[in-house]
């Protein structure tokens, strides 16, 4: 059982660490309630990249290549999409798998219509094309029941597994869990010095969509186990660690893609390309252990030059505006030729600007 005590002052943290070693804790309050947990929508490109880069520890570019292979092999739907919509065919795939492997009552179809205006209507979510999980797919390929355009590697199958489980879960009933929140009062030599909060799931009452997930998937849905506690229980504090954590951390690739998506920068077809280009041009580098991304000296110099001399043209607002104008053309809300003329005039003004001092 682990608990975290957040202290913003280093000296206080260090003195607290010394005090807590060998201390006692008493449970002073326990609250339990049954909660309903709903599945997440199926993957679109952004959420697939976030999950896959983190779970598979692969680059965004590599994940997109694996997805391209799966798509070309007819194993998943189109992987460059910002839609979570599920077609009737998709619902049928989920229904057939759920009825064959779980209780038919677990099937709870949802369309997951996207709310954003710019979402491409023709595309649906990223989903499997047949009611076969990764193990069944491996068997069918090995036995020749399915012919693929590429040799499926373990990475292909692991990505397929992520897509498959996320999709099938999205078409199943919510789960019901017994949730517990407990407050522990920490004592040193009989004197209360701190309070710790422990919360988590005691029991999954009705599994629902969690039947198709693995234990590694559950924390993403807020399902973390916690031991049953009662008021008056007394516990001994075991190992104590002091860890320094910053308020903000550098991006990893999954977080960078997530932030781009939230800010309206890039589209499903360009997320991985943008990240890959930053690496290829030497603007950023990645720390292997943590997979954090940092700017290089070259990247900082290029950013400084462009933001100083062409601030408006390379700003986040201009980028987002251009994306929205392109979406408007795609949706038939704006004329292609008119938007091209506007863009040409904007570019012309930049070209005619006097060269900045070196």
Swiss-Prot record:
Pfam families for this protein: Topoisom_bac
Residues of the active site: 78
Domain Topo IA-type catalytic: start-end pairs: 1-351
Main location per the UniProt record: cytoplasm
Subcellular location: Cytoplasm
CDD domains: TOP1Ac
GO CC annotations, alphabetized: cytoplasm
The keyword Cytoplasm is assigned to this record: yes
InterPro entries according to UniProt: Reverse_gyrase (IPR005736), Topo_IA_cen (IPR013497), Topo_IA_cen_sub1 (IPR013824), Topo_IA_cen_sub3 (IPR013826), Topo_IA_core_domain (IPR023405), Topo_IA_DNA-bd_dom (IPR003602)
Miscellaneous remark of the record: Starts on a TTG codon. This enzyme is the only unique feature of hyperthermophilic bacteria/archaea known and seems to be essential for adaptation to life at high temperatures. It may play a role in stabilization of DNA at high temperatures.
UniProt comment concerning the protein's domains: Introduction of positive supercoils requires the cooperation of both the helicase-like and topoisomerase domains of the 2 subunits. The helicase-like domain probably does not directly unwind DNA, but more likely acts by driving ATP-dependent conformational changes within the whole enzyme.
Assembly and binders: Heterodimer of an RgyrA and RgyrB subunit. The topoisomerase domain is shared between the two subunits.
Family assignment from sequence similarity: Belongs to the type IA topoisomerase family.
Protein name: Reverse gyrase subunit A
Gene: rgyA
């Amino acid at each position: 059982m682990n608990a975290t005590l957040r202290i913003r002052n280093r000296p206080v943290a260090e003195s607290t660490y010394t005090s807590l070693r060998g201390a006692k804790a008493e449970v002073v309050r326990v609250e339990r309630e049954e909660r309903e947990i709903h599945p997440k929508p199926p993957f679109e490109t952004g959420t697939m990249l976030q999950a896959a880069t983190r779970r598979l520890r692969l680059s965004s570019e590599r994940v997109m290549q694996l997805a391209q292979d799966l798509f070309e092999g007819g194993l998943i739907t189109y992987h460059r999409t910002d839609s979570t919509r599920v077609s009737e065919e998709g619902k049928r795939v989920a229904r057939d798998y759920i009825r064959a492997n779980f209780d038919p009552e677990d099937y709870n179809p949802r369309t997951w219509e996207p709310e954003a205006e710019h979402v491409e209507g023709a595309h649906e979510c990223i989903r499997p094309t047949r009611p076969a999980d990764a193990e069944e797919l491996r068997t069918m390929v090995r036995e020749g029941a399915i012919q693929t355009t590429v040799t499926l590697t373990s990475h292909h199958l692991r990505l397929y597994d992520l897509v498959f489980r996320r999709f099938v879960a999205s078409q199943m009933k919510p789960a019901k869990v017994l949730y517990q929140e407990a407050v522990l009062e920490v004592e040193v030599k009989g004197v209360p010095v701190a309070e710790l909060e422990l919360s988590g799931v005691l029991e999954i009452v009705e599994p629902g969509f969690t039947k198709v997930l693995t234990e590694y998937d559950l924390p993403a849905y807020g399902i973390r186990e916690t031991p049953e506690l009662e008021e008056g229980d007394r516990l001994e504090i075991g190992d104590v660690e002091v860890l320094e954590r910053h308020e903000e951390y550098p991006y990893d690739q999954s977080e960078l893609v997530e932030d781009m998506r939230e800010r309206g920068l890039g589209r499903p077809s360009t997320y991985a390309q943008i990240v890959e280009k930053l690496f290829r041009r030497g603007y950023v580098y990645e720390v292997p252990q943590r997979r954090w991304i940092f700017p290089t000296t070259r990247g900082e110099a290029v950013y400084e030059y462009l933001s100083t001399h062409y601030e408006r043209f390379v700003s986040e607002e201009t980028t987002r505006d251009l994306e929205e104008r392109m979406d408007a053309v795609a949706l038939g809300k704006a004329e292609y030729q008119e938007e091209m003329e506007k863009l040409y005039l904007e570019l012309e003004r930049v070209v005619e600007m006097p060269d900045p001092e070196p």
